[in-house]
């Protein structure tokens, strides 16, 4: 499937908000109470929050396009934008999401490969991420890409304290 990747700018905030809310909800609705989900989506994907993240020089967002449709997106962090500091000289893969109708077509690999290329081009020694302990499909995806579990942390969704596994890959 032909695709292109392009950086997200503040002009794209409405589309970023739309795909962020949609893909997070689809992915985590089965595990999350409705009130907790609504609170998380309203807080973490608020327009001002997303603009601040886009403008942060240590965070970068990218859209994956199939034709003229936004199929998915990616967010990577370095430096103080990272949620944890597992290793020096690391890149955090904070978000990698595809819309449901674009899953299982190899596009997750396209986004992942793009993130890894960024890390390698910037001479990072490691990539890391957090993955929900109940998100088995994502765990298998990251294992296939060479990640190993090295710890865990709490990820708060509304009032729900969920456990994310911390995964690390040496580059």
Give the positions of each predicted feature.
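Acetyl-CoA-dependent GNAT
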Residues: 7-13, 17-30, 38-101, 112-114, ...
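C-terminal "cap" of GNAT-fold acetyltransferases
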Residues: 87-91, 125-139, 143-145, 152-171
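Short acidic-aromatic loop segments in the C-terminal HATPase_c
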Residues: 97, 147-148
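Short coil/turn segments at alpha/beta junctions that flank glycine-rich nucleotide-binding fingerprints
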Residues: 105, 122-125
């Amino acid at each position: 499937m032909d695709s292109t990747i392009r950086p997200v700018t503040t002009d794209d905030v409405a589309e970023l908000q739309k795909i962020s809310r949609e893909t997070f909800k689809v992915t985590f609705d089965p595990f999350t109470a409705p009130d907790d989900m609504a609170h998380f989506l309203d807080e973490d994907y608020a327009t001002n929050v997303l603009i601040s993240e886009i403008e942060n020089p240590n965070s970068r967002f990218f859209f994956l396009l199939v034709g003229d449709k936004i199929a998915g997106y990616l967010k990577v962090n370095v430096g103080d934008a990272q949620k944890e500091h597992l290793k020096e000289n690391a890149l955090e893969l904070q978000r990698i999401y595809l819309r449901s109708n674009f899953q299982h077509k190899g596009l997750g690999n396209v986004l992942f490969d793009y993130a890894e290329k960024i890390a390698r081009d910037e001479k990072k020694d490691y990539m890391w991420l957090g993955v929900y302990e109940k998100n088995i499909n994502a765990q298998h995806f990251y294992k296939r890409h060479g990640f190993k579990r090295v710890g865990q942390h709490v990820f708060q969704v509304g009032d729900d304290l969920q456990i994310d596994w911390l995964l690390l890959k040496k580059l």
